[in-house]
């Protein structure tokens, strides 16, 4: 059985992304944020602005997000059952914090060929203009 609806699959095919997909409850997202804060306190030198990669490898709580069935089922609906997680990144942008990430395509930075893979972006807080919301651009996947 396919997790994503035919409309969602068509949106992915036509626009290059699907949004939103409800993955975590508010309480699950809060637990994940608290886990990240705990890791930052325990490992302040390792988890700085440049070292927020693959933290799921040291945290079972964050690893559970990587293996969340809703994420995996959605990914499987797009690319099939053969799924490999290459990396995870914590991108933390607090309200009114300085910093900017320009528009980009993940394929440029990931470096995998062919481009038959997906990125699952999971928000642990509300994404809005005060904290630098995520914007998806249609048709740039073509």
How would you name each of these model-derived features?
Residues 1-112:
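Non-heme Fe(II)-dependent double-stranded beta-helix
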Residues 89, 105, 122-126, 138:
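Short, structured patches in soluble enzyme cores that scaffold and shape functional sites
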Residues 111-129:
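Short, conserved beta-strand element in jelly-roll/cupin
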